[in-house]
Design a protein with these regions (language model features):
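An exposed, glycine/acidic-rich loop-and-rim segment of catalytic or binding clefts
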Residues: 4-201
Length: 201
């Protein structure tokens, strides 16, 4: 029997300046589902004297993160952020430790790691991250029902063309990818990404 998956994604812009992303998936046979988005956010805006995200103030609601190997795959460990460049529990500039002499920073060429979000209950909609531009005071908050949040700082982007002839340099935007943990199918102790028939993701 062939696997027949049905996937539904809805993007909604609200009058409260929210972007709401909802996913739904069903299957007729056991399969793997771990949906996310890879939107880049450059809240400093075009014309900002500091075009990179180095001065953007960031907060991530996580006590733990997943270290990666040199191919950017999680090693399977779950490590504390405390005392590392990955500690964003208190707001700090993204660029403060992005070039630190740290093996994990080197493996990701910056931040490209999954955070284990602090949750009171599985599946609850809760605060995950916040960024603020200190110049314009623009602020973006991320809430999710997912257990993980991949933070990617545009480490491999260079010279991307944008609106009004603007060119975006390396690390000029950040991604917050709410999801289950990467490599979950190979790690039985990670939150499961298996979807069974008659279940709804």
């Amino acid at each position: 029997m062939c696997i027949r998956d049905s996937v539904w994604v809805a993007y909604t812009l609200t009058d409260d300046n929210e972007l709401v992303i909802k996913y739904q998936a069903t299957t007729n046979k056991l399969t793997i589902v771990n949906l996310t988005n890879h939107g880049f956010f450059s809240i400093q805006g075009i014309g900002n004297p500091t075009p990179t995200i180095d001065n953007i103030i960031c907060e991530v609601n996580a006590d733990f993160y997943l270290p990666i190997d040199e191919t950017s795959i999680p090693t399977g460990e779950i490590l504390k952020v405390e005392g590392t460049p990955f500690d964003f529990r208190k707001p700090k500039p993204i660029g403060q430790d992005i070039n630190a002499d740290n093996e994990q920073i080197k493996n990701g060429s910056g931040y490209d790691h999954n955070y284990v979000l602090n949750k009171k209950e599985e599946g609850e909609l809760s605060f995950a991250a916040r960024i603020k531009d200190p110049v314009s005071c623009r602020t973006m908050e991320v809430y999710t029902t997912e257990p993980g949040l991949q933070m990617y700082t545009g480490n491999f982007l260079e010279g991307i063309k944008g609106q009004h002839g603007a060119t975006f340099p390396r690390r000029s935007a950040v991604c917050f990818e709410a999801q289950h943990f990467p490599d979950s199918p190979n790690r039985s102790y990670f939150p499961s990404v298996r979807l069974k028939p008659r279940e709804t993701y």
